[in-house]
């Protein structure tokens, strides 16, 4: 006999329980394909396929028996208080932070975790702006249910379909069956791709610039394609002068109680703002410029992004950064020296160059070891500064892999308008400078003609060459 708990998950990806599957069989499902169509079980990673097959056989042969585990009643006084926060009149934060996260998008280190923001408007009609990542699903749903109470959820505005914001859409629409989703045509197509055609039917496509009255509040919807996916839009609440900005103006890091940007050490957060922008959105400067142009026509008192703190003061600070970043304009005239060194000889030459640059008046020179630093940090520093020195050993007749990877990252994230100097090392047949120059072709960066070639180590006789390279860098800063 196959004993099962109807409330237990059989497919965690699609959040399908044994009870859901048993119900699907009662309604005529006969094959695994039928189960997939009706419940989405097995449609994602496939690890549940064997369980589904065994349970399906047990149901069809009459050998399945439901065994409901008794649950102790929990009084409301024992339930942990939700983490919703008021943003302004009628608008609440209902998101949450995942402090256990160590990588964002499986690649970017987030040592301080990650926040996944969602907002609820309580007007005559209720509006939820985006959902959250699966990692914070339970806290988000508690926040939402507590704030709504007996009220229904009327609308779900979907700004962006990336799963860190869209993973719980199906759950929200299941819990509030009369809720209507609002999104761009591109987002509706993705709804069908992620969750199936039936759920996509719950979405109303919205045109660019269309407005909606929810009671006191007037919402207008504005397309923001490629910031940083094609289906993205933002929402402007004319009544509270709030911009719900999707991924724009977001950052890495969990929220540690301080919900607003004016409550945190901004210099600490700005480094992560920059790293977030340059690595997530950096390639799409043109689309960001278009969004900034739209935003300039709005009277904005606060910006509510999908990651990081809410901006309600000094909005000019982050807007100015976005203008620079999206036009690939350096924030400061300075130098980052990114090097790939195996035994330390190339690193020593870079340290010597850094000292010479400092003596000549260049402030805040940054040395970064590509074998130790994650590329996202180096990309952020390269966006920040006007000049970049790339120094690499020759390896297997080409570039050291970490340097090659970094230059590909530069190209991938669209870094341009920088002045680049090259240094190479090789005990025989050094070719690293030529390989770097070839990779940089077409990147809209200016490569200085002066290059340094080391033969195993930096010689005293080459210090003059470093002086000349430093002078060339200084001259190009004017």
What function would you assign to each model-found segment?
Residues 129-131, 153-161, 181-184, 243-247, ...:
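Active-site neighborhood of phospho(di)ester-bond hydrolases with catalytic His/Asp-centered motifs
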Residues 84-145, 234-237, 242-245, 346:
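Conserved beta-strand hairpin/beta-sheet module of binuclear metal-dependent hydrolase folds
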Residues 75, 79, 85-89, 183-232, ...:
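Metallo-beta-lactamase
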């Amino acid at each position: 006999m196959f004993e099962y708990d109807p409330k237990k998950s059989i497919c965690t990806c699609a959040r399908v329980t044994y009870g859901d599957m048993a119900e699907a069989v009662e309604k005529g499902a006969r094959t695994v394909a039928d189960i997939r169509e009706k419940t989405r079980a097995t449609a994602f990673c496939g690890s549940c396929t064997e369980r589904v097959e065994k349970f399906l056989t047990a149901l069809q042969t009459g050998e399945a028996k439901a065994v409901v585990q008794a649950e102790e009643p929990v009084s409301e006084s024992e339930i942990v208080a939700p983490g919703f926060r008021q943003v302004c009149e009628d608008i609440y934060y209902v998101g949450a932070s995942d402090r256990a996260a160590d990588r964002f998008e499986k690649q970017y280190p987030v040592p301080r975790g990650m926040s996944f923001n969602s907002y609820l408007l309580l007007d005559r009609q209720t509006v939820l702006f985006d959902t959250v990542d699966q990692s914070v699903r339970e806290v988000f749903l508690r926040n939402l249910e507590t704030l709504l109470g007996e009220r229904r959820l009327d609308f779900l505005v979907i700004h962006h379909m990336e799963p860190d914001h869209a993973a719980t859409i199906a759950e929200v629409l299941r819990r509030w069956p009369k809720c209507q989703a609002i999104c761009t045509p591109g987002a509706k197509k993705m709804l069908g791709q992620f969750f199936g055609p039936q759920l996509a039917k719950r979405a109303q496509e919205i045109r660019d610039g269309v407005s909606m009255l929810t009671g006191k509040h007037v919402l207008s919807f504005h397309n923001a394609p490629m910031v940083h996916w094609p289906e993205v839009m933002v929402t402007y609440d004319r009544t509270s002068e709030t911009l719900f900005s999707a991924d724009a103006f977001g950052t890495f890091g969990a929220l540690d109680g301080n919900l607003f940007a004016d409550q945190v050490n901004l210099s600490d957060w700005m480094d992560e703002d920059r790293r977030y922008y340059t690595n997530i959105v950096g390639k799409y400067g043109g689309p960001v410029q278009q969004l900034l142009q739209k935003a300039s026509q709005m009277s904005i008192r606060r910006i509510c992004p999908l990651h990081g703190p809410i901006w309600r003061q000094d909005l000019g600070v982050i807007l100015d950064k976005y203008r620079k970043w999206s036009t690939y304009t350096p924030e400061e005239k300075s130098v980052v020296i990114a090097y790939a060194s195996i035994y330390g000889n190339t690193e020593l030459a870079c340290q010597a160059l850094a000292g010479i640059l400092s003596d000549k008046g260049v402030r805040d020179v940054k040395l970064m070891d590509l074998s130790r630093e994650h590329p996202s940090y180096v990309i952020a520093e390269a966006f920040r500064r006007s000049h970049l020195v790339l120094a690499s050993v020759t390896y297997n007749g080409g570039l050291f892999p970490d340097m090659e990877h970094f230059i590909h990252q530069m190209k991938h994230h669209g870094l341009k308008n920088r002045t680049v100097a090259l240094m190479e090392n090789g005990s025989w047949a050094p070719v690293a400078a030529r390989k770097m120059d070839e990779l940089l072709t077409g990147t809209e960066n200016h490569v200085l003609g002066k290059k340094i070639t080391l033969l195993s180590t930096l010689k005293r006789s080459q210090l003059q060459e470093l002086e000349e390279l430093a002078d060339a860098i200084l001259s190009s800063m004017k």
